[in-house]
Amino acid sequence: MCSWSLSSHTLTSPVRQAAMEPKSSSCGGAGIRLRLLVVLHLLLLVPSSAMAFNYADALAKSIIFFEGQRSGKLPPGNRMPWRADSGLTDGAQYNVDLVGGYYDAGDNVKFGLPMAFSTTMLAWSVLDFGKFMGAELPNARAAVRWGADYLLKAATATPGALYVQVADPNQDHRCWERPEDMDTPRSVYRVTADKPGSDVAGETAAALAASSMVFRRADPAYSARLLHAATQVFDFADRHRGSYSDSLASSVCPFYCSYSGYHDELLWGASWLHRASRNASFMSYVEANGMQLGAGDDDYSFSWDDKRVGTKVLLAKGFLRNRLHGLELYKAHSDSYICSLVPGTASFQSRYTPGGLLYREGSSNMQYVTTATFLMLAYAKYLRSSGATASCGDGGGGARGEVSAAELVAVAKRQVDYILGKNPAGMSYMVGFGCRYPRRAHHRGASMPSVRAHPGRISCDAGFGYLHSGEPNPNVLVGAVVGGPDSRDAFADDRGNFAQSEPATYINAPLVGALAYFAGTTK
């Protein structure tokens, strides 16, 4: 397969490179390129089963992407050599250490809500599909720990406060700068009893709790610290209710407003704490507060903002495996959501592009594709382990009334294969995977010469020349999955089209689990 080798290249390509192909790619010259186009056209006509992908390679790259998003002091083994240390004084002006964590997407802000969600989903990927990760399991754990370390600092630095953001996004977005030499204000934002943020606190509790399970055997002392902090943060979220969007206003909106409110994060956080601690008080909380917090809501998406359907799938596991009848409602709602994704069922109500990609109106569609794919595979696992199916309602008129675990896996596989290259454009939407992939990801660090190639500072205004350049990115952000094509499968490889070309940690995090599953089960 035409693809970058993680062991044989520097992950950096020249700005001007013939045919925009990396030197270490096996893609050849003009004659080979023409033959490849013919072969690619033929490949699109063969059945899905005949178009094989190297899922293990895609898994490795989906994890290495997180190393390109790291903020702070980078370890010697960081596998994105064009990246360097950044944000080393974050929090210092407020006498708090907030060094580390992840930049969310293509900018240099550390947004707490999507970072916590990304960490939760990375942890869930390891918990449910870690056995399929093979040699990548240590790298996946390292990705979880990089996020969890930062969230632990943010949660414990100051009693009665949770630090939820570093940098003013309004100022950051006025510049196009590499993280290594950014000079925009590194303002710090926090939620307190007077300025609550139950949404971001609930998600942080979920992330810490899920991460504690990842390290329960590998590092018991660290695991215990994470779980203790998760319990405290959840208590803070529940005791001082309110949305961080109201408390912090334009500092977080419209960038990561909590549009769904905070009820979903409270139920999500309690559910993860129950799974991590096995403390019955958290299940009692779920049973007593579930309906008030959205257990009865109809919901058809799962994202950094809206956790309702993810919570239901998580809790449905308890019903399926342990027959906890207080959780039967969550099984019913999970069935409804899952069936809504599967064409031909009585409950089907999703939209797909002509090429077969799940599609939701709005920016960065791939975030919904990867979360839905993850939930289908997780739910398939829970159904299979209990010998159950998903009930889709009245199967009259030729519509199917139930869906099996195997059918869910097949639907999920089509989404993963679309991302990796089985689509009308014949391209991978993962940077560095395959012969054709996005060359102009909307990403500051990738789009500008690295500090190693160009040590001199590139100013705020000068950087915009790189944003608006039509040249491919000089640095390959290996493993990054971009926002993806539109409703007609059309994709503009345009750095200025952030809705389609910007990668994000919360796009990749759920995909890690899905790729692990197929890497471990596909022969």
Curated annotation (Swiss-Prot):
GO molecular function: cellulase activity
Pfam family, one: Glyco_hydro_9
Catalytic activity: Endohydrolysis of (1->4)-beta-D-glucosidic linkages in cellulose, lichenin and cereal beta-D-glucans
Keywords: Carbohydrate metabolism, Cell wall biogenesis/degradation, Cellulose degradation, Glycoprotein, Glycosidase, Hydrolase, Polysaccharide degradation, Secreted, Signal
Cellular compartments per GO CC: extracellular region
UniProt-annotated glycosylation sites, renumbered to this chain: N279
Enzyme class label: hydrolase
SUPFAM superfamilies: Six-hairpin glycosidases
Compartments where located: Secreted
Main location, first listed in the record: secreted
Organism superkingdom: Eukaryota
Disulfide feature: none
KW Cell wall biogenesis/degradation (keyword) present: yes
Protein EC: 3.2.1.4
Residues annotated as the enzyme's active site: D107, H442, D493, E502
GO biological process, one term: cell wall organization
Signal peptide location: 1-52
Family: Belongs to the glycosyl hydrolase 9 (cellulase E) family.
Protein name: Endoglucanase 19
Record organism: Oryza sativa subsp. japonica (Rice)
